[in-house]
């Protein structure tokens, strides 16, 4: 429900500025959380039966065709970021750390997604729905990629196979 009526220019400016602030604010808060606080066995992160050991992501979403094109924001964070584009190692410790980082990244994108309904407060209804669509289009592929990678890494660790 629209509570604030602004001229179109200011509404668009507010939309762009607020999305930037939300993205950066959530990311900067999330990188402050120690990695040990994330548990891949937690209800949010653990593999669900419907994911079919990650096969759902390839069978339905064809993740292998587009995952490599996703942006990696880690380089923007300097030492606080964990680069996910190029695998830096294949040993067990690195894969476990990478799994924890997939939890952080997934939660980051879920939190960003939760902000989308706020845009109904100053946008028309159709633009509010457009903001929800934008948030879903921006964040859901990144969430899917984190879940897919975590399932894959868990399988590699379980099988004792360091091959990607």
Where are the model-predicted features located?
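Short, strongly hydrophobic alpha-helical membrane anchors
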Residues: 1-7
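Residue-level signature of transmembrane alpha-helical entry/exit and packing/kink sites
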Residues: 7, 11-19, 97, 127, ...
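N-terminal signal-anchor transmembrane alpha helix
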Residues: 10-51
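Hydrophobic, lipid-facing residues on alpha-helical transmembrane segments of integral membrane proteins
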Residues: 13, 17, 21, 25, ...
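Membrane-proximal soluble regions of multi-pass membrane proteins
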Residues: 35-98, 155, 159-164
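Transmembrane alpha-helical segments and their cytosolic interface motifs
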Residues: 94-127
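Hydrophobic core segments of alpha-helical transmembrane domains in multi-pass membrane proteins
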Residues: 119, 127-138
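Juxtamembrane membrane-interface segments at transmembrane alpha-helix termini
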Residues: 140-152
């Amino acid at each position: 429900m629209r509570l604030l009526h602004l001229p179109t220019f200011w509404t668009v400016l507010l939309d762009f500025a607020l999305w930037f602030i939300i993205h950066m604010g959530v990311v900067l808060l999330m990188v402050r959380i120690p990695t040990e606080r994330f548990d891949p066995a937690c209800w949010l992160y653990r593999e669900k039966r419907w994911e079919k050991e990650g096969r759902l992501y390839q069978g339905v979403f064809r993740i292998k065709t587009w995952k490599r094109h996703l942006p990696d924001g880690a380089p923007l964070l300097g030492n606080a970021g964990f680069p996910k584009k190029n695998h830096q190692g294949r040993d067990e410790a690195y894969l476990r750390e990478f799994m924890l980082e997939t939890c952080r990244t997934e939660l980051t994108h879920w939190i960003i997604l939760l902000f989308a309904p706020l845009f109904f407060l100053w946008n028309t209804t159709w633009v509010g729905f457009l903001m929800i669509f934008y948030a879903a289009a921006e964040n859901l592929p990144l969430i899917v990629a984190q879940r897919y990678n975590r399932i894959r890494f868990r399988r590699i660790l379980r099988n004792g196979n360091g091959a990607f």
